[in-house]
Every structure is written in C-alpha cells, then in structure tokens.
Amino acid sequence: MSRINKNVVLALLTLTSSAFLLFQLYYYKHYLSTKNGAGLSKSKGSRIGFDSTQWRAVKKFIMLTSNQNVPVFLIDPLILELINKNFEQVKNTSHGSTSQCKFFCVPRDFTAFALQYHLWKNEEGWFRIAENMGFQCLKIESKDPRLDGIDSLSGTEIPLHYICKLATHAIHLVVFHERSGNYLWHGHLRLKEHIDRKFVPFRKLQFGRYPGAFDRPELQQVTVDGLEVLIPKDPMHFVEEVPHSRFIECRYKEARAFFQQYLDDNTVEAVAFRKSAKELLQLAAKTLNKLGVPFWLSSGTCLGWYRQCNIIPYSKDVDLGIFIQDYKSDIILAFQDAGLPLKHKFGKVEDSLELSFQGKDDVKLDVFFFYEETDHMWNGGTQAKTGKKFKYLFPKFTLCWTEFVDMKVHVPCETLEYIEANYGKTWKIPVKTWDWKRSPPNVQPNGIWPISEWDEVIQLY
C-alpha cells in the first residue's frame, strides 16, 4: 500500500511539473517572444504597413512621375492635414528611414496630386507609360475657358483631370492652369457619355465637383512614408482653401451679345475711368487681403462683371461688399496708409455701416457692410442731410471666386438673384440715371438716426 502511494505521488508530481513546463513554454511563446520580437523586428527596420494597396499605388505613381519628370505635388486634404499635425517629424525624416507607414496607408479611395500644366512637357508619353506600368487611366478634357472671349480659339480643349487606378486605389491628378490674376485654376470634372460611371466612386472625389481657384502655392520636398514628395510649404493654407475654392466664369458669350446691342463706350474718358477703376480695385484688394478681410464685388461693379465682363464706364465708382463679422477696426487706417483718404463714414458697426474712400482721378471706393438675418441679408444706407436710414435686402448668398480685370476676386455665387434684387428683372438694360434711395427694387425705409448720434453715424470729410 505504501509502495502504491509513493508511485501515485511520483506520477502526480511528474504530471504537475510537465503542466507547469508547458505553461512556461506557452507564456514565453505568446507573450515574451511577441514582446521581444516586436522590439527586435523594429530594431532591424521592419516596415509596418508598407504592403497596403494605397501605399503601393502612391509609390508606383511617384516612380512614374519622377522618371518622366512630371512635376506633381500632393494636394490630398486628408494626407496634408496629417502631415501638418506631424510636420516636425516629417521634416526631420530622411529617405528610407521610416519604419511605419503613417500617412499614405490611411484607408481611403483616392490620393490627390496636382501639377501645373505649363510645366508639363510630355503629356502623351506619360499617359502611355502609366498604362504600361499597370495603371488604368482616364483623361477628362474640356474647352479652355480662358479662350471663351476669343471666337477663333473658343473650342480649344485642354486636359483637366486624370484618374489612374491601380488595383482598388486610384490617383486623382488635378491639372492646374495659370490664369491672368497670377493664380491657379482647375476645371469641372464632367463625365462624358462614353465614360464608365463605375470606373471609380466619382462622388467621393474632393476636387472637380466644380471649377476651383487657388493661390499659387510655394512648394517644398519632404519624405513621407519613405517616399519623396512635393507638398505646399504651408499645408494648412491649401487645405483651408479647398472648401472655399469654387470658381465661376464671367459670361463672355452674353457679354459679346450685350455689346452687339449696346455699343461699348471707347471714348477717352471711358478708357481713362476704367483704367483708374481697375487700379483702385487692385489697391483695395491688396489692402483687404493684407488684413485678411474677405470681400466681393457689389452693386454696379458686380453688375458690370456679370453683364459685360468689364467695368461700367458711367458708374464713376468701385463697389465692394464685406460681411460685418469680418470688419476690423484698422480697415480705415489701412486704406488711408494705402493712399485712400476717408471720404465719408455712415452708420456704425452695429447698424448700417458704410465707408467711402477717395481714389485718384475722382474715382470713389464704396465699401458696404452686410448683415445677416434669419432668411435674408441686408446692407444699409444713410442720407447725410436728413439722417434717414435705408435698408437694401438680398436673398442669402455664398461667395465664389471669379476673374475680373485680370484679378481673382469674389462675387456672390448666386449672382443672378443678387443682381435682380438690386436692379430688378430689367438689369440687362443700361440705366445711366440712378437714384440710390428710390431706384433699387430692394430698398426700403429703415427709420432715422437720432440727432444725438449724428456726430458718430454721419461723418463727412
């Protein structure tokens, strides 16, 4: 009996020891080895995430463009925002030193790049080589809007977008074109009938839903996920431009029709006024841009752009609009420092503010401040001799870029509604006699300033 008990005890001890040994082996394999192995693999330069479809597509695209000397730069808002958040790390990363894919491996359907078309020397050869490398490429072309004012050239087509797909990821190459105002423009990505709508999820594209205008970015080269790429030197400035980049063209065909019906005024006085008004608009834009105050063409200046793509020669002033929330207290001083003395100041920031500055050659700059209500916007007017107040109502609007007298400027996107509010349905007919208190269909009385406030709200210089 004693002998049996000893054998049982010995067997139990052996079994327990074996179980403990197995546990130690399991623990080492699934915990310590994993932990230490990760450290070892990292120290040996393991490249985590570099097998992703997104990274491989971007790498191949960069190889393609680099070999063909195609000067592309990254404009993808998602990637640029990530780069900006880790900018110091990105700037200090050398080629090939990255061990983990942090940017180009982020899940997404597209990666957006851009190029400036005037720098592209071998477009056709590039397209063929891209397809030989395994990309399926789609080219979007359309008429060059810069030539719409020239009858003999208005049908010329230019490339606007390329979409090159590799496996399940696509590169969207946005083609930027130079415009007269020293800015970059891209066109609308409009699909023609023969194009396969299922080629890529077009609705997820971040560029091309409408034409866009951007400041010309200064570029710098950085290493991102082991790949050398060009990016805007100020990534967030470009990213912040994207949602506000919508661009609308001047209506060149309608302007030509207008001048066929109403001959253009090419007298010495008209030419001189247009020259002075253009210089005044350029100076005003430079001053407000320096302050960071957005503005748009308003009243007669906006009508001139929309109706005839030019300054109305008998208007005798330049009109700009500014949202009151964008008002800055140093606006007056900034204009005065630019050589534009204050001519009058009506109203106050809380109500009906209007500023007027004197330009050269008796051309006046009028700045109207707009106030937003629940279902409309308005700007105010004041009659100096009586203190009467007036209000001009407009349907709500947003701002778009356009090109006017060789400048990139804002206009209301809903331009027709804006023009009709101010000038009625007959805005196409030139009217040289205009009473600012009675002629506009959107004007209404708005009370009278208390005499005790006149020194503040009616200032003439």
From Swiss-Prot:
Pull the Lumenal topological domain ranges from the record. Answer: 29-461
Q: Name one GO molecular function term.
A: phosphotransferase activity, for other substituted phosphate groups
| Result of altering residue 125 to S | In a patient diagnosed with Walker-Warburg syndrome
- Identify the metabolic or biological route this protein is part of: Protein modification; protein glycosylation
Alphabetically list the UniProt keywords.
Answer: Cardiomyopathy, Congenital muscular dystrophy, Cytoplasm, Disease variant, Dystroglycanopathy, Glycoprotein, Golgi apparatus, Limb-girdle muscular dystrophy, Lissencephaly, Membrane, Nucleus, Signal-anchor, Transferase, Transmembrane, Transmembrane helix
Annotated phenotype, changing residue 225 to N: In a breast cancer sample; somatic mutation
GO BP of this protein: basement membrane organization; cerebellar cortex development; cerebral cortex development; muscle organ development; negative regulation of cell population proliferation; negative regulation of JNK cascade; nervous system development; protein glycosylation
**Catalysed transformations (reactions):** 3-O-[beta-D-GalNAc-(1->3)-beta-D-GlcNAc-(1->4)-(O-6-P-alpha-D-Man)]-Thr-[protein] + CDP-L-ribitol = 3-O-[Rib-ol-P-3-beta-D-GalNAc-(1->3)-beta-D-GlcNAc-(1->4)-(O-6-P-alpha-D-Man)]-Thr-[protein] + CMP + H(+)
Q: What class of enzyme is it?
A: transferase
Q: What is its EC number?
A: 2.7.8.-
Say if the entry is tagged with keyword Cytoplasm.
yes
Q: What is any Pfam family matched here?
A: LicD
Ranges facing Cytoplasmic side: 1-7
Q: Which disease is it linked to?
A: Muscular dystrophy-dystroglycanopathy congenital with brain and eye anomalies A4: An autosomal recessive disorder characterized by congenital muscular dystrophy associated with cobblestone lissencephaly and other brain anomalies, eye malformations, profound intellectual disability, and death usually in the first years of life. Included diseases are the more severe Walker-Warburg syndrome and the slightly less severe muscle-eye-brain disease.
Native source organism of the sequence: Homo sapiens (Human)
Which chain regions cross the lipid bilayer?
A: 8-28
Q: Please describe the quaternary structure of this protein.
A: Forms a complex composed of FKTN/fukutin, FKRP and RXYLT1/TMEM5. Interacts (via transmembrane domain) with POMGNT1; the interaction is direct and is required for normal POMGNT1 location in Golgi membranes.
Give the function comment from the record: Catalyzes the transfer of a ribitol-phosphate from CDP-ribitol to the distal N-acetylgalactosamine of the phosphorylated O-mannosyl trisaccharide (N-acetylgalactosamine-beta-3-N-acetylglucosamine-beta-4-(phosphate-6-)mannose), a carbohydrate structure present in alpha-dystroglycan (DAG1). This constitutes the first step in the formation of the ribitol 5-phosphate tandem repeat which links the phosphorylated O-mannosyl trisaccharide to the ligand binding moiety composed of repeats of 3-xylosyl-alpha-1,3-glucuronic acid-beta-1.
The cellular location(s) given in this protein's UniProt record come to: Golgi apparatus membrane; Cytoplasm; Nucleus
Instruction: Give the bilayer topology.
Output: Single-pass type II membrane protein
The cellular component terms of Gene Ontology attached to this UniProt record, alphabetical and capped at eight, are: cis-Golgi network; endoplasmic reticulum; extracellular space; Golgi apparatus; Golgi membrane; nucleus
Descriptive protein name? Ribitol-5-phosphate transferase FKTN
Q: Which domain of life is it from?
A: Eukaryota
Expression by tissue, per the entry, reads: Expressed in the retina (at protein level). Widely expressed with highest expression in brain, heart, pancreas and skeletal muscle. Expressed at similar levels in control fetal and adult brain. Expressed in migrating neurons, including Cajar-Retzius cells and adult cortical neurons, as well as hippocampal pyramidal cells and cerebellar Purkinje cells. No expression observed in the glia limitans, the subpial astrocytes (which contribute to basement membrane formation) or other glial cells.
